[in-house]
Amino acid sequence: RPEYEPALRKYQERRDELNQKYTDQQQTKQPSEKQSKNWVSVTEINQLIDELTLETKQYKGYAKLSPKELNVFQDRFMLIFWLSYPVRNDLHTTRVITRRAFNALPREQKETQNFIIGGKPAIEFSIGNYKTRKKYGVKKIRVDDKVVLAAMRQWLSVSPNPDYILVNVKNGEPMSSLNITQALT
């Protein structure tokens, strides 16, 4: 209706102005003031990893670990992994599997699930379950950082379900994307 045209134009101009402001901010790759308040520095993450490392040393030789103690091992692994391989929540429901077992899987399973593939020539992270998989295909990441591999081995040696890389330590079920987000906050 013609009587609404001026209001509609004003709204569209304001919308376009705000969209441009948002685009300009995104182009700078700088966090907003609000984001900066919630930002955690790499130094702070490394300090937390050091604290968790000291805690894991205290539990060495324990026959049975409580869920709280298991979380220390898993949290340490997650932080170390994500510092070297920033893959957001792509570790959700990731199975740990040998290369031979992976090669024997049907193609569809390889392309729709996530795996940590052990064995020669190197450990590999295969990501087949992620939002833009149809566009980019399965991502494969070679895991060759010695600190990450040591943390992974340590975590899997105490994990209640070493068939999955991240689990709910109380029941051994694989972690979902939501569980990972909750664990990191």
What are these regions (language model features)?
Residues 14-16, 84-87, 130-133:
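Short, solvent-exposed loop/turn segments at secondary-structure junctions
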Residues 42-90:
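Basic, Lys/Arg- and aromatic-enriched nucleic-acid-binding interface segment
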Residues 85, 95, 128, 167-169:
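Short His-Asn-centered micro-motif
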Residues 1-13, 143-144, 180, 184:
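Non-catalytic DNA-binding core/recognition domains of DNA-processing enzymes
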Residues 134, 140-185:
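Active-site/catalytic core of tyrosine-dependent DNA strand-transfer enzymes
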Residues 94-146:
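Conserved tyrosine-mediated DNA breakage-rejoining catalytic core shared by Y-recombinases
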Residues 1-2, 71-75, 81-109:
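A short, glycine-centered helix-capping/turn motif at helix boundaries
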Residues 3-63, 170:
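Flexible interdomain linker/hinge and immediately adjacent N-terminus
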